[in-house]
Design a protein with these regions (language model features):
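Class I SAM-dependent methyltransferase Rossmann-like catalytic core
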Residues: 20-27, 67-91
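A short glycine-rich, Lys/Arg-flanked "PGG" loop and its adjoining helix->strand segment in the class I
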Residues: 195-208
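A short acidic, Gly/Pro-enriched loop at the edge of an enzyme's catalytic core
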Residues: 168-180
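Conserved beta-strand signature within the Rossmann-like core of class I S-adenosyl-L-methionine
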Residues: 209-216
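Conserved class I S-adenosyl-L-methionine
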Residues: 103-113, 131
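Core SAM-dependent methyltransferase catalytic element
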Residues: 239, 247-261
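Conserved SAM-binding loop of SAM-dependent methyltransferases across substrates and taxa
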Residues: 114-126
């Protein structure tokens, strides 16, 4: 028994967490395939139609540029590359500190992906219990099993519970959590087009005075309309709310934080 436990410990010690990239590998792979298809079609049309060959060549160049850009973005975001993902998540937790979270109690991570934010929170707040939920839908490189693996490797599995769910209808009673965080999730929730209602659902599960820090593409009017009006519409429901406006090309992107009433 002890020998088996020792072997398990050694295996974990040599394992590394696998934090999936926000840019799915399917995107550059698909781009590469499209590039090859356009290039091949251009070669076939070269003798029969110079115009068609030219247009297909332009399309191949555009597809290649897109693929190259997405590969660069994937490298910059990855923990093994530029590490941008980790920096963004750290900023969310710093914002939660700014909101007044003292590191005690229950914290909810909405849309946990591969568990990176949840694990960072567990390490930063050793006295907190973390609940992390995600839909883990098709098209993403995430899964509950991956999250649990990462938490075990990072030695925080005893304080994190991962569960499948829908951010539009959280499976928790009101006044359950002392804090809530979310990063790049709300705009992806297709089950609720009304993002005001979606944010209110996230706030519903907070205890009175609970802290929150939400980060997303809040500059996207297609999702949030006028963000200042959006925040003002939330103000009656919270005791404190602040919108952090940053340039679109900066990192981290825009976020807001505060306390539930």
């Amino acid at each position: 028994m002890k020998q088996n436990q020792a072997m398990d410990f050694l295996e974990l010690k040599h394992q590394k967490p696998e934090y999936a990239n926000w840019v799915s590998m399917w995107i550059p792979l698909s781009g590469s395939l499209v590039t090859l298809l356009f290039a091949g079609a251009a070669a076939l049309c070269a003798k029969s139609s110079a115009l068609a060959a030219g247009l297909l060549t332009v399309a191949a160049i555009v597809a290649f540029a897109f693929t190259f850009y997405m590969l660069r973005a994937r490298t910059a975001l990855s923990y093994a590359g530029g590490g941008v993902q980790g920096k963004v998540l750290e900023d969310v937790l710093k914002t939660l500190d700014q909101a007044g979270f003292n590191g005690h109690g229950k914290l909810l991570d909405i849309g946990c992906g591969s568990g990176a934010m949840s694990i960072k929170a567990a390490k930063k707040y050793p006295r907190a219990l973390i609940t992390a939920m995600d839909y883990w839908g098709a098209g993403w490189d995430y899964s509950q099993r991956l999250c649990e693996h990462n938490a075990q490797v990072e030695k925080v599995a005893s304080r994190i519970t991962f569960r499948k769910g829908d951010a539009a209808k959280l499976d928790f009673m009101a006044d359950t959590f002392d804090a809530a965080v979310s990063n790049f999730v709300f705009h992806e929730v297709r089950s609720q087009k009304d993002k005001h209602a979606l944010v209110l659902e996230a706030l519903r599960v907070l205890k009175p005075g609970g802290c929150f820090a939400f980060q997303d593409i809040f500059f996207a009017k297609s999702h949030y309309g006028d963000i200042n009006a959006f925040v003002e519409a939330l103000r009656p429901y919270v005791s404190e709310i602040h919108f952090v406006d940053t340039p679109r090309n900066s990192c981290p992107p825009r976020s807001f934080w505060g306390r539930w009433a």
